[in-house]
Structures are given as structure tokens and as C-alpha cells.
């Protein structure tokens, strides 16, 4: 709470990060095609565990293979480097979806496959980029450093990335760290929080 009268309490449902490595982009769970990563970059909130994702050819990408179905949400924190665009991609054997995001202003560009997209501004030029797709036979989640809207043709350039998450459902929850296996965060519980007299459709 920000003071005695205003503020908010975030209570989240149970959720599982299906990404086996959420922030170790150098590990083998992250397959790299014409890209490389370097560690210990300055990240969200002044952290020092962000990564520089660089491409060495057109259509360079990094991806994690995860088999799932139904509504799934892929999110990653991204900041511009020498390139000012990123493309997020959810690959399915039946119907894939992607979106381009402008890292100068957080606005979305070209999308395909009718995804639901949200971009959340963070501190120091970072954005949490979120894409949701409801489809069958999802098999991998990709990040492309992009040269411009609808353009990954350049042969060099970089962006910063941090804190990837894949979760079942139609929206992103707060970040759940993983290291080698999926991790579940239990639902939040608020005890002694009052009654219907305090929290109802008109107040609270």
C-alpha cells in the first residue's frame, strides 16, 4: 500500500512457468539459430542478470521447445540494443502466432495468427512483452531480434532479454524463476482481510 488510504494488493492464482530455464539463456534448453548470448547485463530494477541477444544472420532466433495446448501466454522482458524491435513467436503444428514490438515506445507492429498482445513498460527502457495464443499442438516459443516492423532480414544487431515465462492461461502472472525444471507458484492467500462489509461491489 502506498499510504493509509490508497494502494493495491496483488493476489494471484496458482501458476506454473513451463520454461525449463527462465533466465539462463546460455543453457541447452534454449536452442539458438544464428544467435549468441552474453551474460551479466543490467536488467530490470538494476539487476545484473540480463542478457545481450545478438544475431549473426537473417532470421536469427532463440527458442525453447515446450509441448502444450490450449491458451498459453509467453512473456519476456526486453530492451532495445543496437536494434529497436523484437518479434515474439508461438509455434504450433496447426496455427502459429507472432507479434513485432517497437522497443523505442512499446507499441506493437505487425502480428499474425490473431494473438492477444500486451506490452507493459518497466524501468530504464525495459518492456515486458506478452503474447497469448489459444491453439492446439504448441511446440516452441521464439524470440527474434528484429530490424524493423515485419523485418528480420538483417545479418547483425542485438537486443537485451530477461525473465522468460510460459504459462497456461490467457494472461501473464508475475515472474516465476525456473532452473532446469518447471516451477509452480501457489495461489496467494490473504488472511484477516475483512468481510463483505469491507470488500463488496461498491467499496473496498
Each language-model region and where it sits:
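Extracellular and organelle-lumenal recognition/adhesion modules and their flexible linkers in secreted
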Residues: 1-204
Amino acid at each position: 500500500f502506498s499510504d493509509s488510504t490508497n494502494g493495491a494488493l496483488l493476489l494471484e492464482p496458482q501458476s506454473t512457468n513451463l520454461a525449463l530455464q527462465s533466465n539462463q539463456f546460455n543453457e541447452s534448453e534454449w536452442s539458438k539459430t544464428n544467435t549468441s548470448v552474453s551474460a551479466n547485463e543490467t536488467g530490470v530494477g538494476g539487476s545484473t542478470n540480463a542478457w545481450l541477444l545478438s544475431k549473426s544472420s537473417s532470421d536469427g532466433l532463440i527458442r525453447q521447445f515446450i509441448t502444450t495446448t490450449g491458451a498459453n501466454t509467453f512473456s519476456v522482458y526486453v530492451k532495445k540494443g543496437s536494434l529497436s524491435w523484437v518479434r515474439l513467436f508461438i509455434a504450433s503444428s496447426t496455427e502459429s502466432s507472432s507479434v513485432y514490438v517497437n522497443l523505442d515506445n512499446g507499441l506493437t507492429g505487425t502480428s499474425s495468427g490473431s494473438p492477444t498482445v500486451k506490452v507493459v513498460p518497466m524501468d530504464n527502457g525495459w518492456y515486458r512483452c506478452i503474447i497469448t495464443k489459444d491453439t492446439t499442438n504448441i511446440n516452441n516459443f521464439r524470440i527474434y531480434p528484429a530490424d524493423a516492423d515485419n523485418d528480420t532480414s538483417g545479418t547483425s544487431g542485438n537486443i537485451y532479454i530477461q525473465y522468460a515465462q510460459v504459462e497456461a492461461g490467457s494472461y501473464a502472472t508475475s515472474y516465476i524463476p525456473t532452473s532446469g525444471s518447471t516451477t509452480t507458484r501457489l495461489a496467494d492467500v490473504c488472511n484477516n482481510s475483512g468481510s463483505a462489509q469491507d470488500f463488496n461491489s461498491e467499496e473496498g
